[in-house]
Swiss-Prot record:
Effect recorded for residue 84 to A: Does not affect interaction with ric8a
PROSITE patterns: EF_HAND_1, EF_HAND_2
Organism of provenance: Drosophila melanogaster
Binding positions for Ca(2+) 1 per the UniProt entry: 73, 75, 77, 79, 84
Gene Ontology cellular-component terms listed: cytoplasm; synaptic vesicle
Disruption phenotype: Increased number of type Is boutons in neuromuscular junctions of abdominal segment 3 muscle fibers and reduced nerve-evoked excitatory junction potential.
Annotated keywords: Calcium, Cytoplasm, Lipoprotein, Metal-binding, Myristate, Repeat
Quaternary structure and partners: Interacts with ric8a in a Ca(2+)-independent manner.
Sites where the protein binds Ca(2+) 3: 156, 158, 160, 162, 167
Name the UniProt record assigns to this protein: Frequenin-2
Role summary: Plays a role in synaptic transmission and axon terminal morphology. Inhibits ric8a-mediated promotion of synapse number but does not affect ric8a-mediated neurotransmitter release.
CDD domains: EFh
Length: 187
């Protein structure tokens, strides 16, 4: 593939300043850093996992990083291009709460069917528990399964064992700890 995206075109910058919360200067800075870390202009899943391992040395972030990678890789080609990277970074770092919750919903909805099942929720919660390592937990949240049960008890209003985007959004807003656990912060 060679030096894909080594020079950022002005029309790409214009599109990204419109589509993201970054300025042209910030986009250029991020692009420079992205190319430094990914000289061919592509971030692979293994590279993505390696980055996560730097931030979570006491746990195993591999599973979680792979799940996040899937959401970053919008076109599902097995690599994150700069535009995909900056769009996801814009939402996760500067998006409003609804944007962040929609992004998180996409993370949890592994099969992209518009619902989060208990199994999908367990998959993510288990990955988070593996990533952060042994952390003190309350009795009702000391295993991934207990955490999932608690989340579904709070969010699954129609008791169909799956969460819609609306149930997920409302449930997350009703319990600030869930938003915190998603590392999404506030507005």
């Amino acid at each position: 593939m060679g030096k894909k995206n080594s020079k950022l075109k002005q029309d790409t910058i214009d599109r990204l300043t419109t589509d993201t919360y970054f300025t042209e200067k910030e986009i250029r800075q991020w692009h420079k850093g992205f190319l430094k870390d990914c000289p061919n202009g592509l971030l692979t899943e293994q590279g993505f996992i390696k980055i996560y391992k730097q931030f979570f040395p006491d746990g195993d972030p591999s599973k979680f990083a792979s799940l996040v990678f899937r959401v970053f890789d919008e076109n599902n080609d097995g690599a994150i291009e700069f535009e995909e990277f900056i769009r996801a970074l814009s939402i996760t770092s500067r998006g409003n709460l609804d944007e962040k919750l929609h992004w998180a919903f996409r993370l949890y909805d592994v099969d992209n069917d518009g619902y989060i099942t208990r199994e999908e929720m367990y998959n993510i919660v288990d990955a988070i528990y593996q990533m952060v390592g042994q952390q003190p937990q309350t009795e009702d949240e000391n295993t991934p399964q207990k955490r999932v049960d608690k989340i579904f008890d709070q969010m699954d209003k129609n008791h169909d064992d799956r969460l819609t985007l609306e149930e997920f959004r409302e449930g997350s807003k009703a319990d600030p700890r869930i938003v915190q656990a998603l590392s999404l912060g506030g507005d």
